[in-house]
């Protein structure tokens, strides 16, 4: 099934839009120029097959979970939000945007920027595969091991590249959330220091998101959201 999807994606290789100026600026700050943004394309739609699976209730201890309403464990059917293949990201139609930094520098959707950052890390993993050992099929194999590939725990001595590919993307997604809402928190600093082991992320005192972010849920308790290291 994976090989079939891979072939379909290759047939669509000529499709996709380039990154916007604001997206490039954000990525340059986030990744320190370690992504060749000219090669990146975002495609509206993914040929991935819908699957039925048990969606677990994730622990509400991270910024990326706390900005959303609680989710109950249940059986769901759906397609993945995106499929990253080399320098292309195929985005599910309901999540595709013409600009994930829309509104910058006045205000941006935090959820959109987090989603964009997550997927761009997969592009970074591919473009820097001599460092990461990445291949799309390796990343896909993480989804068939019975555990949630996106969950991670930060240990004192853990290196960024010690994590799985989806975990690395989730760590950067969490970092964007914490940097936006709780920049001075211990967790934000720990995430920053760990990510900086692998690429030159912008200093925490630099504003890479603009003047404000829009939250996806009215009941978010922002104060201390990343206070736990």
For each feature predicted by the language model, list its residue ranges:
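Sec-dependent signal peptide recognition
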Residues: 1-9
């Amino acid at each position: 099934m994976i090989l079939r999807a891979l072939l379909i994606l290759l047939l669509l290789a000529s499709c996709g839009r380039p990154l916007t100026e604001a997206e490039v600026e954000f990525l340059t700050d986030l990744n320190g120029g370690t992504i060749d943004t000219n090669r990146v394309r975002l495609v509206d739609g993914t040929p991935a097959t819908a699957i039925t699976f048990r969606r677990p209730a994730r622990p509400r201890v991270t910024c990326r979970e706390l900005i959303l309403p609680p989710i109950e464990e249940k059986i769901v059917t759906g397609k993945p939000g995106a499929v990253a293949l080399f320098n292309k990201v195929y985005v599910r139609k309901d999540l595709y945007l013409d600009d994930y930094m829309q509104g910058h520098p006045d205000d941006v959707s935090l959820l959109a920027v987090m989603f964009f950052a997550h997927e761009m890390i997969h592009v970074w993993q591919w473009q820097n595969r001599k460092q990461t050992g990445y291949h799309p099929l390796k990343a896909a194999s993480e989804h068939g091991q019975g555990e949630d590939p996106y969950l991670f725990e930060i240990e004192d001595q853990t290196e960024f590249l010690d994590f799985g590919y989806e975990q690395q993307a989730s760590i950067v997604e969490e970092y964007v959330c914490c940097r936006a809402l709780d920049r001075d928190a211990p967790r934000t600093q720990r995430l920053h220091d760990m990510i900086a082991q692998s690429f030159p992320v912008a200093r925490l005192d630099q504003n890479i998101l603009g003047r404000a972010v829009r939250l996806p849920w009215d009941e978010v308790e922002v104060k201390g959201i990343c206070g736990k290291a």
